[in-house]
Amino acid sequence: MSLLRKLPNKSFVHQSIVTARFLTTANAFPDEPTSVYYDDLVNAAGSERDLETVRYLLNKRMRDLCFNTANTFKFITNTENSLSILDDLYKTLARLDKGFTRKSAYDTLIARLCKLRKIDEALRAVDIMAEGEFGLNAGSFHPILSALTRGKKMEDAWRLINLMKQVKISPDLTAYNYLLTAYCFSRNLTAASDVLKKMEEEGLGADARTYDALVLGACKAGKVEEAFVLLRMMVDDGQSGLYSTFAHVNGVLLKMGYYAQAVKFVMVCGGRDIKLDTELFGSLASKLIGLGRFDDAKFILNEMNSRGIKMGHKLRDYYEINVKLTVNSQAKETK
């Protein structure tokens, strides 16, 4: 994980050659290009190992406000032949326009390498950013921390936190949230508590992701009351909460057989956000049907219908056949 590597020098083809290549083809730049359009061109050039064209396109797309995406470096794949281009690609990115253009390219490449689980290669990009002063910040480390914690490589994740400090990059709330979530997911509440202490020492607060991790940990440990306390703290702290946070609570209630409480929980949480309602009510209805709790499911579906909450195709079919049709039949029999 050594930092501060020096970049080798290399002669490059003049940009005019690259420009001519594209402007003389049938695929001339449109008046209003998109990020998808540029991604296709970058990947085509990258697949041909034409890094001068890649450099030209990465510069031009930023001038056209077509920002990099998760697909920008899709030509990098998990094969030896593809990865052999990285040394030259690192050097090519170092010659991009200064500022956001260059930083964004490195950050996007780091994210791509992490998706391929090539952590060492991602760290090489970090080295280059640090050495060249290319805008390295906490965000550059996030994909690496995410990959390490998802892979349960917690010692490596902590080493990366220390590495950030060595290069004078303060780990931010998001960085610690990755660690916190991993520990809570694995039910290691002692380690999670240590992370919280570290966050407090460094003057970091809590955001929706922090509470999501803590609620997850409480639910994984079967501590429902503690999860409810955390939800109240989250609301008092001004955080709206993620869908997954409420899903954690619903999941543990159903797992423990507290079906009535799960229905009540969704009813209490509903009415604040239509997207949240769609996910919460729909998910609960589907799970109740799967558990054979048909009366509870019908109640939730009726609530969804009366509140104008959109149902998925399967839920809509179930509602039309098992709820609405039944109600109509009963009404006719009554008459």
Summary of predicted features, one role per range:
Residues 1-110, 115-124, 128, 132, ...:
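N-terminal targeting peptides
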Residues 29-30, 65, 97-98, 117, ...:
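Inter-helix linker motif
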Residues 34, 38, 54, 69-74, ...:
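Pentatricopeptide repeat
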Residues 50, 82-85, 118, 153, ...:
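Residues in the short coil linking paired helices within alpha-helical repeat scaffolds
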Residues 57, 88-92, 125, 160, ...:
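Alpha-helical solenoid repeat scaffolds, predominantly canonical TPR units
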Residues 60, 92-95, 128, 163, ...:
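The canonical alpha-helical register within tetratricopeptide repeats
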Residues 212-322, 328-335:
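Structured C-terminal portions of repeat-based eukaryotic scaffold domains
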